[in-house]
Amino acid sequence: MKSSGPYERETIGERLRPAKISILIRPRILPAIFAFLAFCSSSLAENWEATLSKDPVGNFPELRPLRGSYRFGWSGLTAATGDVHFTKPAENKFQLDGTGRTIGFVRALFKLDVSYQAIASAETLRPIETQQTESYRSKKITTHLTFTNNGVTRARTEGKGAAEAKTRQFNFPNLFDLFSAMLYLRSQPLKDRSVYRVVAYPATNAYLATVTVIGREKISVHAGSYGAIKLDLQLKRIGKHRQLEPHRKFRRATIWVSDDAERLLLRIEAQVFVGTVFAELQSVSFENPK
C-alpha cells in the first residue's frame, strides 16, 4: 500500500481549523466594517454642508416691481399658464404673488389651480413666510411656511373642507424658500463657471440646490430676444438625518436668465420623470419706468 504524503495525512479537524478561525473572526470584523461605513456616511453628510455657499448678499441692483406671465408645458404643448406680481410693499420686504392653472384638454384630464405668495427680507434676502394653495378636482392642499434663522415650521392641510393642519419642523440655519433663493442667486455676480450651493425648502421637503453658471448665449422667447445667462440646476433631497438622497421625480434643469439690469427668468427646461417640461416668459411689464 502506498504511504500517504504529509498533506494527505492531515486530519479533517486540521482542515476545518482555518474555517473555524474565520467564523470566529467574522462576527468581530463585521461590526467594525459597519462602524467604519457609518463614520464615512457621517463624514460625507458633514462634507456637503461645508460646501454651501457662504457669499453674502450681492450688490446687484434690486428688481423693479413688475407683472409677468408664463406658459408651462412639455414637448412644445402648452398645458398651463401663470401670472406673477413682484412688489416691494415695505422698505424692508419683497413680495411675490402668483397664480396658475391648467388649460385646454389638459384641464379636462387634470384640473389644477394654484395660488402662491412669498415674503422675503429686502435686506438679507431670507424668507419670512410662504403660503401656497393647490386646488384639485377632488381636494385642496394648503401649505404655510414660517421661517426663522434656525429653520422652518410647515403647517399643511389637505381635504375638501376644513381640516386640521399637520405641522412639521425642519431645523437648518439660513434656509431659503423658492422665492428667496432666486433673489439671492440673482444678487450674485454669476460669473461663467461659478457654482452656488444653497439649501431650499420650497413646500414639503428640504433640498440641496447646486447652481452652475454654464455661460452666456442668445435666446428668443415669446416676450422677446435676450442675451441670457445659462444656468444648470441639480437637486438632492435632504433626509431626516441630513443625508443626501436622489430626487425621485427631478433629474436636472437648464435655466436662462436675462443678462441685463433686470435678470428676468426667461425659460426653464427641466428633465423630470415624465420627460422634458418647460416654463417660458410670455410678457412682462414694469410698474416703475426707468
Where are these regions (language model features)?
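Bacterial N-terminal signal peptides
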Residues: P31-S41
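An N-terminal domain-start capping segment
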Residues: I33, T124-T130, E134-R137, F172-A181
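Hydrophobic, well-structured mid-protein blocks that either form specific transmembrane helices
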Residues: L145-S187
